[in-house]
Amino acid sequence: GLIDKAGLNPRLARILKKTACIIFGEPVDAATGRVYHTNVDFELPGPIPVVWKRTYYSDAAMDGPLGYNWHHSYNLGIRQLEEGAFAFRHADGRESFLPVLKLGESHFDRREQLAWTLDGWGYLLTDIRGLQYRFDGPENRSGYRMVSGISTKDGFRLRFEYASGG
């Protein structure tokens, strides 16, 4: 919303959030007309907490797994671009860019705080919490390699499987 665009202090933004909703009619951005809506449908505790969060972006122009312009927290994927880079779709639906690597190489994205590695099993992202996201499956119909697993260094793992269409 407008609070995020203004770059306000996050603590102050939490205080102002309720006011902004009343004044600006959230989830609609009054300046752009963009609709942004998010829901956490369920959470399961554990070594790798499962948090199912849905997000709607009115201007996303994408046919997501939950419908047009809908994104969810496990819709993570990488897509190789012609420019020698990968687009990485984050849990919140944003995309950032990562370089194509040779086997055994690594790259650290300072802005996103992600370590990007190519090993014998495929591409692996490690976040600041130490969670590892594996992308070793086939491309889906949109050209993304979807996350196939999330694991901890202690060996706990969530595994994702997809139908042939992605």
Q: What residues fall within each predicted segment?
A:
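Short secondary-structure "cap/edge" segments that initiate or terminate local elements
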Residues: 1-106
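Extended charged/polar low-complexity repeat regions
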Residues: 68, 84-166
